[in-house]
């Protein structure tokens, strides 16, 4: 099976979510199902069906997290340097708007653009891999092409 690269912070976040699902949410759903069963006829019991649906979601997410964490390859970005690779924190300037943005290149399971965590498989991350400070890149987006200049690369 293919390894899933991720940072220690990303691994810890997913592991904490898994613990929460197993120790808090799963038991709560089981209690909700038991309570709903006490109300009698299950065929028209909305509480029962809602609890079963929630159980399905919780169990599915537990399986997904177990699979991701079993295949995880934790990479320590502080041990890296040089050109851009997984784990790099990159500051870019949009060459059109002059807007500065900072992203850390992370694994798919921990990506969150709002927090500046860029999926390594995204078009922007793929364009950045292997580049150095001062390089310019072109990225094709649904809204058209964008040009960025790489201002800094850090491994933190």
Swiss-Prot record:
Keywords: Coiled coil, DNA-binding, Transcription, Transcription regulation. Pfam families: GreA_GreB, GreA_GreB_N. It comes from the Bacteria. Gene3D superfamilies: Transcription elongation factor, GreA/GreB, C-terminal domain, Transcription elongation factor, GreA/GreB, N-terminal domain. One of its GO terms (molecular function) is RNA polymerase binding. The keyword Transit peptide does not apply. The keyword Cell cycle does not apply. Residues 46-66 form a coiled coil. GO terms for biological process: DNA-templated transcription elongation; regulation of DNA-templated transcription elongation. Necessary for efficient RNA polymerase transcription elongation past template-encoded arresting sites. The arresting sites in DNA have the property of trapping a certain fraction of elongating RNA polymerases that pass through, resulting in locked ternary complexes. Cleavage of the nascent transcript by cleavage factors such as GreA or GreB allows the resumption of elongation from the new 3'terminus. GreA releases sequences of 2 to 3 nucleotides. Belongs to the GreA/GreB family. This is Transcription elongation factor GreA. The lineage of its organism: Bacteria, Pseudomonadati, Pseudomonadota, Alphaproteobacteria, Rhodobacterales. The gene is greA.
């Amino acid at each position: 099976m293919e390894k899933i690269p991720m940072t220690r912070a990303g691994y810890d976040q997913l592991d904490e979510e898994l613990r929460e699902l197993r120790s808090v949410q799963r038991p709560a759903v089981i209690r909700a199902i038991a309570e709903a069963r006490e109300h009698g006829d299950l065929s028209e019991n909305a509480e029962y069906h809602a609890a079963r649906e929630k159980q399905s979601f919780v169990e599915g997410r537990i399986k997904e997290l177990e699979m991701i964490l079993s295949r995880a390859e934790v990479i320590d970005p502080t041990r890296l340097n040089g050109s851009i690779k997984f784990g790099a924190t990159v500051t870019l300037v949009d060459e059109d708007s002059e807007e500065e943005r900072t992203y850390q290149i992370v694994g798919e399971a921990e990506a969150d653009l709002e927090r500046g965590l860029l999926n390594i498989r995204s078009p922007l991350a793929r364009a950045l891999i292997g580049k150095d400070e001062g390089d310019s890149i072109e990225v094709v987006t649904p809204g058209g092409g964008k040009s960025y200049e790489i201002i800094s690369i850090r491994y933190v």
